[in-house]
Amino acid sequence: MKHILPILTLTTLAAAASAQSAAAAGLSYNRAGLSYNTDAGAGDNGYSLSVEALVGSSNVWVGASAGLDTKGEDEVTVGYLFKNVVAGIDATAFVGSNDGYGIIARRSLNEVVAGLEGRIVWGQEGGSNDNSFVYELAYNVNSKYQVAVSIADANGVAEETSVTVRYNF
């Protein structure tokens, strides 16, 4: 009985510490975008549409994209968002409808320029050992609009450059 108060105090402190959430990185995950894509290899230039959002107030992330000029270039992805994993980086592990899977790492770069954001995506198609990367630099014009430039790099060959305008909702 004499140890009940210290045990209760330590248990309460441990529960409070584990329930404390990490500071938000200030990144928006509820957004829609229109992209213009230039494909250096195939010459398939065109537009695409993308939407991504968190489900309710959870960390479950869903995304969808579709090529507006081509058939068969659509994908639905589902992932789980880990906020502020290390050094302010948010990481999302995802699986896609085209047997793809990967990790998205995003970070606000406000210490460099206010409104700047970086994103790196690593992915693979199911049954393939080919790595694919997307490198993106984005600028938040205001709380609702973002402009981004990205380069898709599959197997060490920069294949596609995209300019995207996004609306945060």
Residue ranges and their predicted role:
Residues 2-169:
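Outer-membrane beta-barrel proteins
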